[in-house]
Structure formats: structure tokens, C-alpha cells
């Protein structure tokens, strides 16, 4: 179990988790607020 915890704390695993979280956050923001760069007044 100690080796598994060490594996989870390595940089590639943390980077993958962070990028997945960021991608999911961006997808959800774009789902609720589509095209925030285009505002028609």
C-alpha cells in the first residue's frame, strides 16, 4: 500500500489529475455559459 501511495504522489499522476480537473471545469463552464467571448448587445 505504501508503494501505491508513493505512485499516486508522483508528478505525472498529479499532472494528469490536475489536467483532467481543469478540462472538466472548462467543459462545464462552456456548457452553462456557451461562447462567453461573443456578446451581442
UniProtKB/Swiss-Prot annotation:
Cleavable signal peptide: none
GO cellular component: chloroplast thylakoid membrane; photosystem I
Family matches, as SUPFAM superfamilies: Subunit IX of photosystem I reaction centre, PsaJ
KW Chloroplast (keyword) present: yes
Membrane topology: Single-pass membrane protein
Biological processes annotated in GO: photosynthesis
Compartment(s) where it occurs, according to its Swiss-Prot or TrEMBL record: Plastid, Chloroplast thylakoid membrane
Keywords linked to the UniProt accession: Chloroplast, Membrane, Photosynthesis, Photosystem I, Plastid, Thylakoid, Transmembrane, Transmembrane helix
Transmembrane segments: 7-27
Domain of life: Eukaryota
UniProt similarity note: Belongs to the PsaJ family.
Its job: May help in the organization of the PsaE and PsaF subunits.
Protein name: Photosystem I reaction center subunit IX
Source organism (scientific name): Tupiella akineta (Green alga)
